[in-house]
Protein backbone atom coordinates (compact mmCIF):
# COMPACT_ATOMS: atom_id res chain seq x y z
CA UNK A 1 0.00 0.00 0.00
CA UNK A 2 1.43 3.35 -1.05
CA UNK A 3 1.08 6.00 1.64
CA UNK A 4 2.16 9.52 0.76
CA UNK A 5 1.70 10.96 4.25
CA UNK A 6 0.57 14.27 2.76
CA UNK A 7 -2.32 16.07 4.45
CA UNK A 8 -3.07 18.37 1.51
CA UNK A 9 -6.85 18.41 1.30
CA UNK A 10 -6.80 17.91 -2.46
CA UNK A 11 -4.17 15.12 -2.48
CA UNK A 12 -5.28 11.57 -1.57
CA UNK A 13 -2.95 10.01 1.01
CA UNK A 14 -2.79 6.58 -0.66
CA UNK A 15 -1.78 7.97 -4.05
CA UNK A 16 -5.24 7.09 -5.37
CA UNK A 17 -8.85 7.87 -4.64
CA UNK A 18 -10.68 5.74 -2.09
CA UNK A 19 -13.66 3.62 -3.13
CA UNK A 20 -16.93 5.00 -1.76
CA UNK A 21 -20.46 3.62 -1.72
CA UNK A 22 -23.70 5.48 -1.12
CA UNK A 23 -26.91 4.47 0.61
CA UNK A 24 -29.63 6.88 -0.48
CA UNK A 25 -29.04 10.03 -2.46
CA UNK A 26 -30.81 9.05 -5.68
CA UNK A 27 -33.24 11.03 -7.80
CA UNK A 28 -35.74 13.03 -5.79
CA UNK A 29 -33.45 13.50 -2.81
CA UNK A 30 -31.86 16.78 -1.73
CA UNK A 31 -29.14 16.05 0.80
CA UNK A 32 -27.64 13.28 -1.34
CA UNK A 33 -26.75 15.78 -4.06
CA UNK A 34 -24.63 17.77 -1.62
CA UNK A 35 -22.83 14.65 -0.40
CA UNK A 36 -22.26 13.52 -4.00
CA UNK A 37 -20.89 16.91 -5.06
CA UNK A 38 -18.69 17.20 -1.98
CA UNK A 39 -17.20 13.74 -2.42
CA UNK A 40 -16.40 14.38 -6.08
CA UNK A 41 -14.96 17.87 -5.51
CA UNK A 42 -12.78 16.65 -2.64
CA UNK A 43 -10.69 14.52 -5.05
CA UNK A 44 -10.42 11.80 -2.38
CA UNK A 45 -13.21 9.46 -3.52
CA UNK A 46 -14.44 7.40 -6.46
CA UNK A 47 -18.13 6.58 -6.08
CA UNK A 48 -18.23 2.96 -7.23
CA UNK A 49 -21.30 1.37 -5.62
CA UNK A 50 -24.67 2.30 -4.21
CA UNK A 51 -28.16 1.42 -3.09
CA UNK A 52 -29.39 4.86 -4.05
CA UNK A 53 -33.11 4.42 -3.44
CA UNK A 54 -35.59 2.06 -1.80
CA UNK A 55 -37.36 2.04 -5.19
CA UNK A 56 -35.34 -0.40 -7.38
CA UNK A 57 -36.16 1.43 -10.61
CA UNK A 58 -35.06 4.77 -9.16
CA UNK A 59 -31.98 3.15 -7.62
CA UNK A 60 -30.72 1.79 -10.93
CA UNK A 61 -31.61 4.92 -12.92
CA UNK A 62 -29.76 7.05 -10.38
CA UNK A 63 -26.77 4.71 -10.45
CA UNK A 64 -26.57 5.10 -14.23
CA UNK A 65 -26.49 8.89 -13.82
CA UNK A 66 -23.71 8.57 -11.25
CA UNK A 67 -21.73 6.28 -13.60
CA UNK A 68 -21.95 3.34 -11.20
CA UNK A 69 -21.54 -0.03 -12.93
CA UNK A 70 -24.81 -2.03 -13.15
CA UNK A 71 -23.39 -4.94 -11.13
CA UNK A 72 -22.65 -2.56 -8.24
CA UNK A 73 -26.05 -0.90 -8.19
CA UNK A 74 -28.01 -2.55 -5.41
CA UNK A 75 -31.70 -2.57 -4.54
CA UNK A 76 -30.99 -3.47 -0.92
CA UNK A 77 -28.42 -1.92 1.43
CA UNK A 78 -28.01 -5.15 3.42
CA UNK A 79 -27.09 -7.06 0.27
CA UNK A 80 -24.69 -4.27 -0.63
CA UNK A 81 -22.89 -4.49 2.73
CA UNK A 82 -22.41 -8.24 2.32
CA UNK A 83 -21.36 -8.11 -1.33
CA UNK A 84 -18.98 -5.18 -1.02
CA UNK A 85 -17.26 -6.60 2.06
CA UNK A 86 -16.55 -9.80 0.09
CA UNK A 87 -14.98 -8.07 -2.94
CA UNK A 88 -11.24 -7.49 -3.27
CA UNK A 89 -12.11 -4.12 -4.77
CA UNK A 90 -14.99 -3.45 -2.38
CA UNK A 91 -15.86 -0.05 -1.03
CA UNK A 92 -13.59 1.41 1.64
CA UNK A 93 -16.30 3.59 3.16
CA UNK A 94 -20.04 4.08 2.84
CA UNK A 95 -21.97 7.34 2.96
CA UNK A 96 -25.43 6.96 4.50
CA UNK A 97 -27.74 9.78 3.39
CA UNK A 98 -31.11 8.18 4.09
CA UNK A 99 -33.90 9.47 6.38
CA UNK A 100 -33.34 9.47 10.14
CA UNK A 101 -35.16 6.28 11.12
CA UNK A 102 -32.94 4.12 8.89
CA UNK A 103 -29.55 5.35 10.14
CA UNK A 104 -29.07 2.95 13.04
CA UNK A 105 -29.69 -0.32 11.24
CA UNK A 106 -27.80 0.65 8.06
CA UNK A 107 -24.76 1.92 9.95
CA UNK A 108 -24.83 -1.23 12.07
CA UNK A 109 -24.74 -3.48 9.00
CA UNK A 110 -21.74 -1.73 7.45
CA UNK A 111 -19.76 -1.48 10.69
CA UNK A 112 -20.26 -5.20 11.23
CA UNK A 113 -19.05 -5.74 7.65
CA UNK A 114 -15.83 -3.90 8.55
CA UNK A 115 -16.55 -0.78 6.48
CA UNK A 116 -15.99 2.80 7.67
CA UNK A 117 -19.16 4.88 7.84
CA UNK A 118 -19.93 8.48 6.88
CA UNK A 119 -23.32 9.23 8.44
CA UNK A 120 -25.78 12.06 7.97
CA UNK A 121 -27.22 13.73 11.06
CA UNK A 122 -29.02 13.26 13.33
CA UNK A 123 -27.22 10.07 14.23
CA UNK A 124 -30.37 8.06 15.05
CA UNK A 125 -33.88 8.69 16.37
CA UNK A 126 -33.23 7.61 19.97
CA UNK A 127 -30.44 8.02 22.51
CA UNK A 128 -30.38 4.26 23.12
CA UNK A 129 -29.73 3.56 19.43
CA UNK A 130 -27.01 6.22 19.42
CA UNK A 131 -25.32 4.60 22.41
CA UNK A 132 -25.42 1.25 20.60
CA UNK A 133 -23.61 2.78 17.63
CA UNK A 134 -20.98 4.27 19.93
CA UNK A 135 -20.32 0.84 21.43
CA UNK A 136 -20.29 -0.86 18.03
CA UNK A 137 -17.85 1.68 16.62
CA UNK A 138 -15.49 1.01 19.51
CA UNK A 139 -15.89 -2.76 19.15
CA UNK A 140 -15.26 -2.80 15.39
CA UNK A 141 -12.55 -0.10 15.45
CA UNK A 142 -14.02 1.44 12.31
CA UNK A 143 -14.67 5.12 11.78
CA UNK A 144 -18.07 6.76 12.08
CA UNK A 145 -17.86 10.29 10.68
CA UNK A 146 -20.86 12.53 11.26
CA UNK A 147 -21.64 15.06 8.54
CA UNK A 148 -22.02 18.54 9.97
CA UNK A 149 -20.88 20.48 6.89
CA UNK A 150 -21.11 24.00 8.27
CA UNK A 151 -18.16 23.31 10.57
CA UNK A 152 -16.05 22.81 7.43
CA UNK A 153 -16.45 26.34 6.12
CA UNK A 154 -13.06 28.03 6.23
CA UNK A 155 -14.36 30.98 8.22
CA UNK A 156 -15.99 28.75 10.82
CA UNK A 157 -12.61 27.08 11.28
CA UNK A 158 -11.11 30.58 11.51
CA UNK A 159 -13.59 31.58 14.21
CA UNK A 160 -13.04 28.36 16.13
CA UNK A 161 -9.29 28.83 16.33
CA UNK A 162 -9.49 32.56 17.02
CA UNK A 163 -11.66 31.76 20.05
CA UNK A 164 -9.27 28.97 21.10
CA UNK A 165 -6.39 31.46 20.82
CA UNK A 166 -8.11 33.96 23.10
CA UNK A 167 -9.54 36.47 20.62
CA UNK A 168 -12.73 36.95 22.65
CA UNK A 169 -11.27 36.04 26.03
CA UNK A 170 -13.46 33.97 28.31
CA UNK A 171 -16.76 33.16 26.61
CA UNK A 172 -19.53 35.00 28.49
CA UNK A 173 -22.56 34.50 26.23
CA UNK A 174 -23.59 33.10 22.85
CA UNK A 175 -26.57 33.35 20.51
CA UNK A 176 -27.14 30.90 17.66
CA UNK A 177 -30.09 30.62 15.30
CA UNK A 178 -31.12 28.59 12.27
CA UNK A 179 -34.17 30.08 10.57
CA UNK A 180 -36.00 28.94 7.43
CA UNK A 181 -39.40 29.51 5.82
CA UNK A 182 -40.29 26.27 4.02
CA UNK A 183 -42.69 24.89 6.68
CA UNK A 184 -44.84 28.04 6.90
CA UNK A 185 -47.57 27.02 4.44
CA UNK A 186 -49.49 23.71 4.52
CA UNK A 187 -47.59 20.79 3.00
CA UNK A 188 -48.77 19.33 -0.29
CA UNK A 189 -49.73 15.66 -0.21
CA UNK A 190 -46.74 14.67 -2.35
CA UNK A 191 -44.16 16.46 -0.15
CA UNK A 192 -42.64 13.22 1.12
CA UNK A 193 -39.66 14.82 2.84
CA UNK A 194 -41.87 17.25 4.71
CA UNK A 195 -44.33 14.54 5.72
CA UNK A 196 -41.84 12.13 7.27
CA UNK A 197 -40.22 15.01 9.17
CA UNK A 198 -43.55 15.33 11.02
CA UNK A 199 -43.81 11.63 11.93
CA UNK A 200 -42.42 10.82 15.41
CA UNK A 201 -42.03 7.17 14.39
CA UNK A 202 -39.52 8.33 11.78
CA UNK A 203 -37.79 11.31 13.39
CA UNK A 204 -38.06 10.62 17.11
CA UNK A 205 -39.13 13.14 19.73
CA UNK A 206 -38.57 16.36 17.77
CA UNK A 207 -38.87 17.65 14.21
CA UNK A 208 -37.22 21.03 13.54
CA UNK A 209 -35.06 20.62 16.64
CA UNK A 210 -33.55 17.45 15.22
CA UNK A 211 -33.52 18.60 11.60
CA UNK A 212 -31.79 21.97 11.96
CA UNK A 213 -31.42 22.45 15.72
CA UNK A 214 -28.66 19.84 15.75
CA UNK A 215 -26.72 21.96 13.23
CA UNK A 216 -27.08 25.04 15.45
CA UNK A 217 -26.06 23.06 18.54
CA UNK A 218 -23.05 21.56 16.77
CA UNK A 219 -21.90 24.97 15.49
CA UNK A 220 -22.16 26.39 19.02
CA UNK A 221 -20.06 23.54 20.40
CA UNK A 222 -17.55 23.84 17.55
CA UNK A 223 -16.90 27.55 18.10
CA UNK A 224 -17.01 27.75 21.89
CA UNK A 225 -15.34 24.42 22.58
CA UNK A 226 -17.98 23.88 25.26
CA UNK A 227 -21.06 21.74 25.52
CA UNK A 228 -24.44 22.87 26.75
CA UNK A 229 -24.65 21.81 30.39
CA UNK A 230 -28.34 22.53 30.94
CA UNK A 231 -31.20 24.05 29.03
CA UNK A 232 -34.88 24.82 28.94
CA UNK A 233 -36.88 24.58 25.74
CA UNK A 234 -40.28 25.41 24.32
CA UNK A 235 -41.61 23.85 21.11
CA UNK A 236 -44.10 25.75 18.97
CA UNK A 237 -45.97 25.44 15.69
CA UNK A 238 -45.69 28.87 14.07
CA UNK A 239 -46.60 27.81 10.54
CA UNK A 240 -49.54 25.77 9.29
CA UNK A 241 -50.99 23.24 11.74
CA UNK A 242 -48.82 20.13 11.93
CA UNK A 243 -48.16 17.19 14.24
CA UNK A 244 -44.75 18.28 15.52
CA UNK A 245 -42.90 21.53 16.19
CA UNK A 246 -41.60 23.75 13.43
CA UNK A 247 -40.04 26.18 15.94
CA UNK A 248 -38.03 25.87 19.16
CA UNK A 249 -36.77 28.45 21.62
CA UNK A 250 -33.95 27.16 23.81
CA UNK A 251 -32.26 28.99 26.68
CA UNK A 252 -29.03 27.34 27.81
CA UNK A 253 -25.98 27.49 30.02
CA UNK A 254 -22.59 26.41 28.73
CA UNK A 255 -20.24 24.30 30.83
CA UNK A 256 -18.58 27.42 32.26
CA UNK A 257 -21.96 28.88 33.20
CA UNK A 258 -22.17 31.34 30.31
CA UNK A 259 -25.79 31.90 29.22
CA UNK A 260 -27.10 31.78 25.69
CA UNK A 261 -30.04 31.41 23.36
CA UNK A 262 -30.62 28.91 20.54
CA UNK A 263 -33.58 29.56 18.23
CA UNK A 264 -34.66 27.43 15.30
CA UNK A 265 -37.68 27.77 13.06
CA UNK A 266 -38.80 26.51 9.67
CA UNK A 267 -41.77 28.89 9.58
CA UNK A 268 -40.32 32.40 9.24
CA UNK A 269 -41.27 33.91 5.85
CA UNK A 270 -38.34 35.55 4.11
CA UNK A 271 -35.75 33.40 5.89
CA UNK A 272 -33.98 30.87 3.68
CA UNK A 273 -31.03 29.16 5.33
CA UNK A 274 -30.20 31.57 8.13
CA UNK A 275 -27.69 29.76 10.31
CA UNK A 276 -26.02 32.53 12.31
CA UNK A 277 -23.89 32.57 15.44
CA UNK A 278 -22.54 35.29 17.72
CA UNK A 279 -20.09 34.59 20.55
CA UNK A 280 -19.07 37.24 23.06
CA UNK A 281 -16.35 37.11 25.68
CA UNK A 282 -14.74 39.54 28.09
CA UNK A 283 -12.29 40.69 25.40
CA UNK A 284 -14.40 40.82 22.23
CA UNK A 285 -17.00 39.20 20.02
CA UNK A 286 -17.27 37.17 16.79
CA UNK A 287 -20.16 36.79 14.33
CA UNK A 288 -20.64 34.44 11.36
CA UNK A 289 -23.59 34.07 8.96
CA UNK A 290 -24.00 30.96 6.78
CA UNK A 291 -25.66 33.00 4.03
CA UNK A 292 -22.52 35.18 3.89
CA UNK A 293 -20.01 32.42 4.60
CA UNK A 294 -16.83 34.10 3.39
CA UNK A 295 -16.88 36.89 5.99
CA UNK A 296 -16.23 36.79 9.73
CA UNK A 297 -16.90 39.86 11.88
CA UNK A 298 -14.60 40.35 14.88
CA UNK A 299 -14.77 43.24 17.34
CA UNK A 300 -12.06 43.43 20.02
CA UNK A 301 -13.33 45.24 23.12
CA UNK A 302 -12.78 48.98 22.79
CA UNK A 303 -11.43 48.76 19.23
CA UNK A 304 -12.72 49.09 15.67
CA UNK A 305 -14.46 46.10 14.12
CA UNK A 306 -12.50 43.84 11.77
CA UNK A 307 -13.93 41.84 8.86
CA UNK A 308 -11.91 38.73 8.01
CA UNK A 309 -12.51 37.64 4.40
CA UNK A 310 -11.84 34.08 3.23
CA UNK A 311 -8.50 33.86 1.44
CA UNK A 312 -4.83 33.29 2.14
CA UNK A 313 -2.84 35.50 4.49
CA UNK A 314 -4.00 38.72 6.17
CA UNK A 315 -4.68 37.12 9.54
CA UNK A 316 -6.15 33.81 8.37
CA UNK A 317 -4.92 31.04 10.68
CA UNK A 318 -3.21 27.95 9.19
CA UNK A 319 -6.06 25.66 10.29
CA UNK A 320 -8.48 27.71 8.18
CA UNK A 321 -6.09 28.15 5.26
CA UNK A 322 -6.10 24.38 4.76
CA UNK A 323 -9.78 24.66 3.83
CA UNK A 324 -9.26 27.47 1.32
CA UNK A 325 -8.73 26.62 -2.35
CA UNK A 326 -9.39 29.83 -4.31
CA UNK A 327 -8.13 33.42 -3.99
CA UNK A 328 -10.30 36.11 -2.44
CA UNK A 329 -13.02 37.27 -4.79
CA UNK A 330 -13.51 33.78 -6.26
CA UNK A 331 -16.45 32.50 -4.25
CA UNK A 332 -16.43 29.39 -2.09
CA UNK A 333 -19.66 28.31 -0.42
CA UNK A 334 -21.59 25.29 0.86
CA UNK A 335 -20.41 22.78 -1.74
CA UNK A 336 -16.83 23.68 -0.82
CA UNK A 337 -17.60 23.03 2.85
CA UNK A 338 -18.96 19.62 1.87
CA UNK A 339 -15.79 18.99 -0.15
CA UNK A 340 -13.65 19.93 2.85
CA UNK A 341 -15.63 17.51 5.00
CA UNK A 342 -15.19 14.68 2.50
CA UNK A 343 -11.51 15.52 2.07
CA UNK A 344 -10.88 15.34 5.81
CA UNK A 345 -12.89 12.12 5.90
CA UNK A 346 -10.69 10.76 3.11
CA UNK A 347 -7.55 11.63 5.05
CA UNK A 348 -8.90 9.89 8.16
CA UNK A 349 -10.04 6.73 6.34
CA UNK A 350 -6.78 6.46 4.37
CA UNK A 351 -4.72 6.87 7.52
CA UNK A 352 -6.71 4.21 9.36
CA UNK A 353 -6.35 1.77 6.50
CA UNK A 354 -2.60 2.40 6.34
CA UNK A 355 -2.18 2.09 10.10
CA UNK A 356 -0.88 5.65 10.25
CA UNK A 357 -1.56 7.85 13.27
CA UNK A 358 -2.46 11.31 12.04
CA UNK A 359 -0.87 14.28 13.81
CA UNK A 360 -3.15 15.84 16.42
CA UNK A 361 -5.71 18.22 14.88
CA UNK A 362 -4.58 17.46 11.31
CA UNK A 363 -8.25 16.77 10.61
CA UNK A 364 -11.18 18.18 12.57
CA UNK A 365 -14.04 15.75 12.11
CA UNK A 366 -17.12 14.86 14.14
CA UNK A 367 -17.39 11.27 15.33
CA UNK A 368 -19.75 9.01 17.25
CA UNK A 369 -19.42 11.03 20.44
CA UNK A 370 -20.62 14.12 18.58
CA UNK A 371 -23.51 12.15 17.14
CA UNK A 372 -24.49 10.98 20.62
CA UNK A 373 -24.25 14.54 21.96
CA UNK A 374 -26.63 15.66 19.24
CA UNK A 375 -29.16 13.04 20.34
CA UNK A 376 -28.75 14.02 24.00
CA UNK A 377 -29.44 17.63 23.00
CA UNK A 378 -32.65 16.64 21.19
CA UNK A 379 -33.80 14.53 24.14
CA UNK A 380 -33.04 17.29 26.65
CA UNK A 381 -35.05 19.78 24.59
CA UNK A 382 -37.97 17.36 24.38
CA UNK A 383 -37.77 16.58 28.12
CA UNK A 384 -37.81 20.29 28.96
CA UNK A 385 -40.70 21.08 26.63
CA UNK A 386 -42.77 18.18 27.90
CA UNK A 387 -42.23 19.32 31.51
CA UNK A 388 -43.47 22.84 30.78
CA UNK A 389 -40.14 24.44 29.93
CA UNK A 390 -38.24 23.43 33.07
CA UNK A 391 -34.46 23.44 33.25
CA UNK A 392 -32.95 20.09 32.24
CA UNK A 393 -29.37 19.19 33.11
CA UNK A 394 -27.49 17.29 30.42
CA UNK A 395 -24.35 16.37 32.37
CA UNK A 396 -25.68 16.52 35.92
CA UNK A 397 -23.13 19.09 37.15
CA UNK A 398 -23.90 22.27 39.08
CA UNK A 399 -23.71 25.43 36.97
CA UNK A 400 -22.05 28.69 38.12
CA UNK A 401 -23.80 32.00 37.43
CA UNK A 402 -22.32 34.88 35.45
CA UNK A 403 -25.48 36.93 34.85
Swiss-Prot record:
Belongs to the Gfo/Idh/MocA family. Keywords: Oxidoreductase, Plasmid, Signal. This is Uncharacterized oxidoreductase y4hM. It comes from Sinorhizobium fredii (strain NBRC 101917 / NGR234). It comes from the Bacteria. It is an enzyme of class 1 (oxidoreductase). Its EC number is 1.-.-.-. Residues 1-63 form the signal peptide. GO terms for molecular function: nucleotide binding; oxidoreductase activity.
Amino acid sequence: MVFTGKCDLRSPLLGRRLRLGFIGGGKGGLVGRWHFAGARLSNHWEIVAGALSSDPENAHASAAEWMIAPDRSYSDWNAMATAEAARDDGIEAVSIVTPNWTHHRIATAFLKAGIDVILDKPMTTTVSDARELVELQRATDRLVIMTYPYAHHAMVRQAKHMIRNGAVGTVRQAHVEYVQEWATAPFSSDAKGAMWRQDPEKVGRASATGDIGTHAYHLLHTLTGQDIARLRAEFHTCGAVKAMEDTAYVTFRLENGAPGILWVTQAAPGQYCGLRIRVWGDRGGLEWDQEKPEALRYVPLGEQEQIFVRGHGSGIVPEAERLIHLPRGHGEALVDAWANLYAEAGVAVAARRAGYALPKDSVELSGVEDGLKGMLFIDACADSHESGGSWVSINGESIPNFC
